[in-house]
C-alpha cells in the first residue's frame, strides 16, 4: 500500500517508517526539515499540510493510508505572560491537531475517488489521563485527535473510509526521555504496572496493524499502548 507518514524522522515515526517499509509498503515520510528522503513541511505554517499532501501524492500516484504522527511536546508554565501562553497553545494546536485535521480532510477527498482508505492518528495517553501542569495544551491537542478520529469513523464508514487512533504512554523516544529525566524517572516508572516504558517498535507494530490488517468493523477504535498505566 501507498502510505503518507508524518513525523518520520525520529522516535515512533522513524520506527514506524522502518516497520511499514519492512512489511512491503511504499511509504513517503515527512519531517519538518525534510532530512534525507523525507519530505519537508513545517506544520506551524497553515499552508504546509496541503503542500505536503500534494507533494506526496505526486510521488506516490495515489495514497491508501495516512498516518498522522507529527507532533510537539513543549512546556509552558501557567504563570507565563499572556503572549507566551497564547503562542504556545497556538503552536501546539497547529502542529498536533490542525495539521492532522487538514491532512485528514485532503485524504478523505482522495479516498472517496478510490473506494476508501485508512487514517491512523497517533494520539497519547494524555488525551484521557491528562498531563503535567506545563502541558495542558499537549493533552488538549491529543484529546482533539481522539474526537476527530471518532468523528471521521462515524461519518465516513459508509464510504469505506476507516479511522483509528493509537494512544502511547511513555515510549523510548527523545521526548519521553527528556520528560522522564525532568520529573523523576523511577517514580514515574513505578506507575506503569508492566514495569517499563514501551519501545517505539511496539507502537510502530500497532500502527502497522491498524494501517493494513485491522478489520473494518474496528473503525473508530482507540488502542492504548501504555503498559496498563492508564486503563479505560
What are the residue ranges of the model-derived segments?
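Active-site helix of classical SDR
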Residues: 104, 141, 149
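Residue(s) in the substrate-gating loop at a strand-loop-helix junction
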Residues: 124
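Alpha-helical segment proximal to the catalytic Tyr-Lys
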Residues: 109, 154-155, 216
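Conserved glycine-rich cofactor-binding loop
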Residues: 9-10
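Short C-terminal tail/terminal secondary-structure segment
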Residues: 73, 129, 208, 219-232
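Short, small/polar-rich loop/turn modules that mediate ligand/substrate recognition or access, typified
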Residues: 157-162, 218-220
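Substrate-binding pocket helix/loop in short-chain dehydrogenase/reductase
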Residues: 76-93, 188
